Amino acid sequence: MPHLTHFDTAGQAHMVDVGDKAVTHRVAVATGLIHMLPTTFALVRDGTAKKGDVLGIARIAAIQGAKRTSDLIPLCHPLALTKVAVDFELDEADRTVRCTVRAETHGQTGVEMEALTAVQVGLLTIYDMCKAVDRGMVIGDVRLMEKRGGKSGEWVAQ
């Protein structure tokens, strides 16, 4: 039976020791979306929101979120990220904006949490910048899509 690595035998939380792990190229891709009203979607799509370039600011916020992950997630190791790429895909029919983040490092632990945090921060920034016109936006479907590197190798969502 698998065990939770962030707890010792007494059930106390601790930061996992990654000191003996090999330095490898680590990659993680995460995604999520935000659903909004048609009028809100048009503001985002057209770049006419009162607060400015929603997607441009959300992109910077997502990158910053990846960089600050270890400050937000208590047992997450600080990483020297080598790449954070943020992509937004607009779906007019569903009135959604999908945020996809690819994070990379060369290190001893994976970048899944950085990619997931970046997606959430990017989507929260869209919410923040548009909440004056649409408080009913829904953030959802946030998930890890793939990870590569390290002892556990490659994993791709089904």
Swiss-Prot record:
The active site is at D128. One of its GO terms (molecular function) is cyclic pyranopterin monophosphate synthase activity. Gene3D superfamilies: Molybdopterin cofactor biosynthesis C (MoaC) domain (3.30.70.640). Substrate binds at L75, C76, H77, M113, E114. It is an enzyme of class 4 (lyase). One of its GO terms (biological process) is Mo-molybdopterin cofactor biosynthetic process. Keywords: Lyase, Molybdenum cofactor biosynthesis. The keyword Lyase applies. Pathway: Cofactor biosynthesis; molybdopterin biosynthesis. Coiled coil: none annotated. It catalyses: (8S)-3',8-cyclo-7,8-dihydroguanosine 5'-triphosphate = cyclic pyranopterin phosphate + diphosphate. Its EC number is 4.6.1.17. Belongs to the MoaC family. Homohexamer; trimer of dimers. Catalyzes the conversion of (8S)-3',8-cyclo-7,8-dihydroguanosine 5'-triphosphate to cyclic pyranopterin monophosphate (cPMP). This is Cyclic pyranopterin monophosphate synthase. The gene is moaC.
